[in-house]
């Protein structure tokens, strides 16, 4: 059974949000691993001879929070996509009740809030780390140039800026997609409430609205 266009577009957005969530979680986790398990958001560095060393770092729960939010959004999007595919190709009846659209809107608001918080954490946390690098390490004018510098073993910071930037970009793209999802659900909810039980559908042909038995003629 063919899916309605608004729902089809909504499912495509869910798939895109799933990919964004996986990118964010993977980028933050790999970046954390390259710093020997430390969460370098809001972190600072120092020079130890000619190598860069970690001076301070954030609580591990901060990076875990960012990854957990991204994974939760990805799992929800994946599950919802599978559900509607099952309904379309197995059940064959596409029906969205107003109650569940309200639930979707509520969850969308929750996800938008946490994605906004996550994006701000990644943005400000990365900027704090970059400010420390620019003030500590000489001969660099951009944060990404520190990727090519020598770091104290076992730190492997060759792609730290690229990974953190990818994580932040994926979060903001995810946030934008969820705003579109909210608009699509609101449109479908409004269209669903236009025709209420007990009212005639103006687009229905006259034969569908006439009584089953003809009324007797007037005397």
Curated annotation (Swiss-Prot):
Q: Where are the transmembrane segments?
A: 6-26, 69-89, 105-125, 167-187
Q: Where in the cell is it found?
A: Membrane
Gene Ontology cellular component terms for the protein in this record: membrane
InterPro entries assigned to the protein according to its UniProt record, in alphabetical order: TMEM179B
Q: State the coiled-coil residue ranges.
A: none
List the PANTHER family hit by this protein, alphabetically. TRANSMEMBRANE PROTEIN 179B
Similarity comment text for this entry:
Belongs to the TMEM179 family.
**The protein's name:** Transmembrane protein 179B
The species this protein belongs to is: Danio rerio (Zebrafish)
